[in-house]
Amino acid sequence: MAKLNRKLRQDSTDRYKTKLYLWRNLGGLIPEDMAISVTESITADWKQYNDMMSKVRNETLDILKTNKVATEDYIGYIAFAEELAHQVWKNKNSSPDPNTANEASKTDLESKYSDVYGLDVTVLDAIYNAVIPIIMGGGS
């Protein structure tokens, strides 16, 4: 238990995730090494996803500044980028043909955001072209 307690003192995020895993699995009656390794694996997955989403947001902001988009419209474009990135992430991990699925997602989201929210299609295309390499290429 000392090893687990040392781990719990390191970081509040790890502490929370480890406790959550312990509480949800057999009332905490699992080996501590298993809890630690699973927590580290989950944390690594979340970190990879969150790092990619952060890159998507930063790239989107650069595109919006380059195209001189009004500041009040930023939230719509960022929402489009995040929703698109999430769809691309899901397609990458589950679809047999992610490129076709990505094009379908782009078409659906683009029509939604341009027709309903009145966003510029050329900016949406630029965001799409920036999001695809970030997510499909692993975040570069």
Curated annotation (Swiss-Prot):
GO molecular function: DNA binding
Chain coiled-coil ranges: none
UniProt KW keywords: DNA-binding, Virion
Record's subcellular location: Virion
Presence of the UniProt keyword Transmembrane in the record: no
Cellular component GO terms, alphabetical: helical viral capsid
Pfam families, sorted: MCP_C
Keyword DNA-binding: yes
Domain of life: Viruses
Domain notes: The N-terminus projects into a DNA groove.
Its biological purpose: Self-assembles to form a helical, filamentous nucleocapsid mesuring 900 nm in length and 24 nm in width. Together with capsid protein 2, wraps arounds the DNA and maintains it in an A-form. Capsid proteins probably maintain the DNA in A-form by non-specific desolvation and specific coordination of the DNA phosphate groups by positively charged residues. This certainly protects the viral DNA under conditions such as the extreme desiccation of its host.
Subunit structure: Heterodimer composed of major capsid protein 1 and major capsid protein 2.
Protein name: Major capsid protein 1
